[in-house]
């Protein structure tokens, strides 16, 4: 019996993402050239950050395109994990770039080169404008799409990097302190590293089928036991195919006095959808725990368990 399901379909955000990607990608090239010409490590480090923005935007676009592909006999879950693999690659790339920037900044702090502050300022201001336009393009979709929200946050963080480079250019222009450029690069690198770790950690959690970060497992267990007609449960598993697509399977021992399919199942479905936004659910009902049940994963609402017959009710 189906326990109900819903699948999110990609929204109409392709146009905004394509425009933001075109703007960011074009300016990325200009910023690298500007960083080399002005000898500004801060500009180059900001360009490295903008590279990750470009990759993030490309991932968001690819995810929308790939999500439209139906599941097939080879990949019955579809192609959602592509987004997670790409995010993990993006995190590793960003980590390597950040380490290189910190190392290069260390070398430059010992012997600061002459910085062309005017060119550095102009390029950084252009970057700020590009980021503001990209944020405006993505703002309407970031509240309804996790893909777009991720890209929006990437652009937002790069905007902060542009502000830092502008501040550095002004300081160098009026003080001549060339070391400020390397100091700004260090700050950008230190800003990027924690984000890299969180992105990699979240990606690995999905790939290892861990409980999604936004789901409180203890609260799910509590709410299942609080559902009328549930005596106990075991083998509860919660994971995500990709961000925002949580799935749940569980074996529920029901009270013999209730009809699980007609009374308990609708309550569990509604509770999981309303409280935890989990709509991809498979539930197996039993009158007693199955022999394969893991005692460590068995949770009782009542000490009395009777019967041996089991029936299943699932959904996707």
Curated annotation (Swiss-Prot):
Chain segments annotated as transmembrane: 17-37, 47-67, 82-102, 115-135, 152-172, 174-194
Entry membrane topology: Multi-pass membrane protein
Organism: Alcaligenes sp. (strain CT14)
Keywords: Cadmium, Cell membrane, Cobalt, Ion transport, Membrane, Transmembrane, Transmembrane helix, Transport, Zinc, Zinc transport
Record flagged with keyword Transmembrane helix: yes
Any single Gene Ontology cellular-component annotation: plasma membrane
Name of the featured protein: Cation efflux system protein CzcD
InterPro entries hit by this protein: Cation_efflux (IPR002524), Cation_efflux_CTD_sf (IPR036837), Cation_efflux_TMD_sf (IPR027469), CDF/SLC30A (IPR050681)
Molecular function as annotated in GO: zinc ion transmembrane transporter activity
UniProt xrefs under PANTHER family: CATION EFFLUX PROTEIN/ ZINC TRANSPORTER (PTHR11562), RE54080P-RELATED (PTHR11562:SF17)
Role noted for this protein: Necessary for activation of the czc determinant.
NCBIfam families: CDF (TIGR01297)
One Pfam family it belongs to: Cation_efflux
Subcellular locations according to the entry: Cell membrane
Family membership noted in the UniProt record: Belongs to the cation diffusion facilitator (CDF) transporter (TC 2.A.4) family. SLC30A subfamily.
């Amino acid at each position: 019996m189906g326990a109900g399901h819903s699948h999110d379909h990609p929204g109409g955000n392709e146009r905004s993402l394509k425009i933001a990607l075109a703007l960011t990608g074009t300016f990325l090239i200009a910023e690298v050239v500007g960083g080399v010409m002005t000898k500004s490590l801060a500009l180059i480090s900001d360009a490295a950050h903008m590279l990750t923005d470009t990759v993030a935007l490309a991932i968001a676009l690819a995810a929308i395109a790939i999500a439209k592909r139906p599941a097939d006999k080879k990949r019955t879950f579809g192609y959602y994990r592509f987004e997670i693999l790409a995010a993990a690659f993006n995190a590793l790339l960003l980590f390597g770039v950040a380490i290189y920037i910190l190392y290069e900044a260390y070398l430059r702090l010992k012997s600061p080169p002459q910085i062309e502050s005017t060119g550095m300022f102009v390029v950084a201001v252009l970057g700020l404008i590009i980021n503001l336009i990209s944020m405006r393009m993505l703002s309407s979709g970031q509240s309804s799409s996790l893909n777009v929200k991720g890209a929006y946050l990437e652009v937002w963080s790069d905007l902060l990097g542009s502000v830092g480079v502008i501040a550095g250019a002004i300081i160098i222009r009026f003080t001549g302190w060339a070391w400020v450029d390397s100091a700004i690069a260090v700050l950008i690198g230190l800003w990027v590293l924690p984000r890299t770790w969180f992105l990699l950690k979240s990606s690995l959690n999905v790939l290892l089928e861990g409980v999604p970060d936004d789901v409180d497992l203890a609260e799910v267990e509590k709410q299942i036991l609080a559902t009328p007609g549930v005596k106990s449960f075991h083998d509860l598993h919660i994971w995500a195919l990709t961000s925002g697509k949580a799935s749940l399977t569980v074996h529920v021992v029901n009270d013999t006095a209730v009809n699980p399919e007609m009374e308990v199942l609708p309550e569990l479905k509604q509770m999981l959808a309303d409280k935890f936004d989990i709509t991809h659910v498979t539930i197996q009902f039993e009158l007693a725990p199955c022999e394969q049940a893991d005692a460590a994963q068995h949770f009782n609402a009542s000490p009395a368990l009777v019967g041996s017959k089991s029936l299943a009710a699932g959904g996707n």
